[in-house]
Amino acid sequence: MIPGANGYRLPTLCEAEYAMRGGDPNAPDWDYLFSGAVSEPGKERYSINKGLDPVGWYQYNNKTGVSGTSDSDRENNTYYSYQGTHEVGLKKPNRLGLYDMSGNVSEFCYGKIDWTFTSKIQYTGELEINPVRIDETGNGRPSYGGSWRAGAGGAIVHSFPDNIDSSFSASIGFRVVRSGD
């Protein structure tokens, strides 16, 4: 980030997670698995998770808006579809009024990452507010939110997979934020 800049930019990982969690660490939805929605009990790490249905489009509800129940639904294309993005506002917003923070399109964050570099970062024990890790030799850009092409795991509020920022995909986009004074 450029100190003192107050224009539009990509959010940092911390800003994205804060927005996904709804902005209030004391609210119950801060600990929800998805942005504004709880997980289906016992399905926290499953690709199919009906808990995501109220707030997000993903691989297993992209056709009808409701998750299938098994891989057989995937095989007969009952619910599973590579249909593409959906109009914003068809699912519920989170506490901040933001739509599609989990699902629909995965969104880039600020920074460049080489995951081998990132794994070498040593935690110093110092409190950092909104840290930004940049490795200019990296070709990965962190993203958040999951997409219509991915299972429910990609839509988890603390999941930040990397994407190659020079690649083109209908399932990756961006959302801008504006820096304060």
Can you say where each PLM-predicted feature lies in the sequence?
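Short proline/glycine-enriched turn/loop segments at secondary-structure junctions
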Residues: 130-135, 161-168
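C-terminal catalytic subdomain
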Residues: 155-159, 170
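Short, structured beta-strand segments at or near domain termini in extracellular proteins/domains
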Residues: 168-181
